[in-house]
């Protein structure tokens, strides 16, 4: 025996796996010698089929539109750590927000993440890397490292995915500008061939940035091409002098919609046609402007919006529904992340004041923040995807009343789902109502601010006076019949700390986590958005405090101390089990507030 055995099993009429019904089977293997069991291994897997063509993307024969979220590899306050519980929580909340697919931008997904996607039902576009021959940042994977390791690393990624029914696409790269030149095109061909040889079941794709490729074809570029950056005294370039991906994002913000326009030019098509011909599904980054025309120019091409702006979801989704060869849309991003600091952060002049001038550490562009809180835009997404008819309300923070924020391409609002702004009575703010009805009405304590027609499932009320009480949004159809309504209430009474653990039992494996949501609430249990204080968390017993933080972009505080200031009345503590059974006692305290306690149990 050479250490490998192949066994063929037949499962009659298997229950098929998909994102709505994630049916899994368990395979157990045992190793014996002379009748004695030496070892055993178990793995979960699922049965499903996928097929794609210009008529659509099919899972188990059913056409499936991909409601996608680009997701980076970090886990917010935990940093770049992957825990089973962290990944399961992320997938669970992404599903709650309406997503049915994630793109692991721009690194291969961890086993823990894929296991969670298998269990909970989430399609995955697993992405290999962010660069091939051209550097985007100092000390990245490009050039020598890539050339030496890409075959081994790509092989490892694809073999890792073999038993995961959640993985439907293997992406071999992101925004590779050298696709415009023969060297990059040949690499694309080789990588696509290898990916298909290793796993012919899954589609091969790549996130193509048409504008970057068009520039590279003309001898220019954003990143490390020879004509970029500054030369040193010897006439050569160093990575410290070259533009980085942060520079590209800054440029995109300044250019606004120009990138979509550049993508629509004939030069962009010419620069990318060869490389895209090697892909099963063409990933378009910020190129929805090409969807309709490429159905005519390239009638055999299947397209996915591999990276898009969240604010463009309505327009993009209409195109997805209209053109069957466009199989889905992946917004940047579904979940906020550490790095690319301030990419989507709405900036105010008050950020320069003492105490508010700390560096921004998060991207700020996720429709779910780094602590896992769903922002108001997620309700808009669900309305666009026709998953609900309940309206949503987004209130521009009254803590910045009178200030004009500098918005980003990636996030054009920092609205909060709150009508609790103590100390700002009488101040005016902008309120956005998200609704699928033709008409909406906004009321504060029964006083109507009028009915408005919706545009792209939104209606904006620019000057709403804050008065404590109840704010209500009502969605009507075109003849004035009420479809649905939603309300938010002001916090009342004395402030207290409220702790909400997401589970109470952990295993003694030193890996299990419990997320404890911390809110400053009034007597009616509603969060107070203006009463931010430093919260101290002390953990004793059979566990420890792994992280404590908030979603504030410019916090100036560490996630790994036991004190952190709330943001809009919220913070998040992550408790980690030890390797012994017992009780975990969690105490939260803040100046002037009564201590609060919660007890968890480690069972084993």
Describe the function of each predicted region.
Residues 1-111, 116, 120-121, 168-169, ...:
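Secreted/periplasmic carbohydrate-active enzymes, especially glycoside hydrolases
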Residues 12, 32, 36, 40, ...:
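Active-site mouth of glycoside hydrolases
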Residues 125-127, 132, 345-353, 489, ...:
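Flexible glycine/proline-rich, aromatic-decorated loop/lid segments
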Residues 170, 193-197, 204-511, 523-527:
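Substrate-binding clefts and catalytic carboxylate motifs of secreted carbohydrate-active enzymes
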């Amino acid at each position: 025996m050479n250490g490998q055995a192949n066994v063929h099993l037949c499962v009659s009429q298997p229950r098929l796996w998909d994102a709505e019904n994630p049916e899994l089977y368990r395979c157990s293997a045992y190793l014996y010698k002379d009748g004695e069991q030496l070892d055993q291994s178990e793995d979960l897997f699922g049965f499903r089929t996928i097929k794609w063509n210009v008529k659509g993307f099919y899972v188990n024969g059913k056409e499936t539109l991909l409601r996608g979220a680009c997701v980076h590899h970090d886990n917010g306050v935990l940093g770049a750590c992957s825990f089973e519980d962290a990944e399961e929580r992320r997938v669970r909340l992404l599903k709650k927000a309406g997503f049915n697919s994630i793109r692991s931008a721009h690194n291969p997904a961890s086993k823990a993440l894929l296991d969670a996607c298998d269990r909970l039902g989430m399609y995955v576009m697993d992405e290999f890397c962010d660069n091939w021959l051209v550097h985007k940042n100092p000390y990245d994977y490009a050039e020598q490292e890539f050339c030496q390791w890409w075959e081994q690393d790509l092989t490892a990624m694809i073999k890792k995915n073999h038993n995961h029914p959640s993985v439907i696409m293997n992406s071999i790269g992101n925004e590779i500008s050298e696709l415009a030149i023969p060297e990059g095109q040949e690499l694309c061909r080789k990588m696509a061939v290898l990916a298909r040889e290793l796993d012919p079941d899954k589609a091969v794709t790549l996130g193509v940035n048409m504008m970057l490729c068009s520039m590279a074809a003309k001898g220019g570029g954003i990143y490390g091409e020879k004509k970029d950056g500054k030369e040193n005294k010897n006439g050569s370039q160093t990575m410290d002098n070259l533009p980085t991906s942060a520079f590209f994002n800054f440029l995109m913000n300044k250019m606004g919609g120009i990138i979509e326009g550049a993508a629509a030019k004939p030069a962009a098509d010419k620069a990318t046609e060869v490389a895209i011909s090697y892909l099963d599904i063409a990933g378009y980054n910020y190129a929805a402007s090409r969807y309709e025309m490429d159905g005519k120019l390239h009638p055999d091409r299947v397209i996915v919006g591999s990276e898009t702006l969240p604010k463009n979801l309505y327009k993009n989704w209409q195109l997805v529904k209209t053109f069957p060869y466009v199989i889905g849309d992946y917004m940047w991003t579904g979940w906020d992340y550490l790095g690319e600091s301030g990419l989507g952060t709405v900036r105010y002049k008050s950020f320069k004041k003492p105490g508010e001038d700390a560096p921004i550490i998060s991207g700020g562009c996720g429709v779910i923040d780094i602590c896992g809180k769903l922002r108001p835009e997620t309700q808009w997404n669900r309305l666009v995807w026709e998953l609900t008819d309940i309206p949503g309300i987004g209130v521009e923070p009254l803590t910045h009343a009178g200030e004009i924020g500098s918005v980003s391409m990636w996030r054009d609002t920092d609205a909060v789902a709150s009508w609790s702004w103590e100390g700002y009575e009488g101040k005016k703010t902008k309120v956005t109502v998200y609704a699928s009805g033709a008409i909406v009405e906004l009321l504060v304590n029964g006083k109507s601010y009028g009915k408005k027609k919706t545009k792209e499932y939104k209606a904006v009320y620019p000057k709403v006076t804050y008065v404590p009480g109840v704010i209500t949004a009502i969605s009507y159809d075109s003849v004035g019949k009420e479809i649905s309504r939603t309300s938010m209430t002001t916090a009342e009474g004395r402030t207290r700390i409220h702790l909400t653990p997401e589970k109470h039992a952990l295993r003694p494996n030193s890996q299990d986590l419990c997320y404890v949501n911390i809110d400053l609430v009034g007597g009616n249990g509603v969060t107070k958005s203006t009463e931010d204080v430093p919260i101290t968390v002390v953990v004793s017993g059979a566990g420890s405090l792994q992280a404590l933080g908030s979603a504030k972009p410019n916090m100036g505080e560490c996630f790994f101390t036991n004190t952190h200031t709330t943001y809009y009345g919220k913070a998040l503590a992550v408790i980690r089990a030890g390797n012994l059974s017992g009780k975990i006692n969690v105490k939260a305290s803040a100046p002037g507030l009564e201590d609060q306690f919660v007890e968890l149990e480690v069972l084993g």
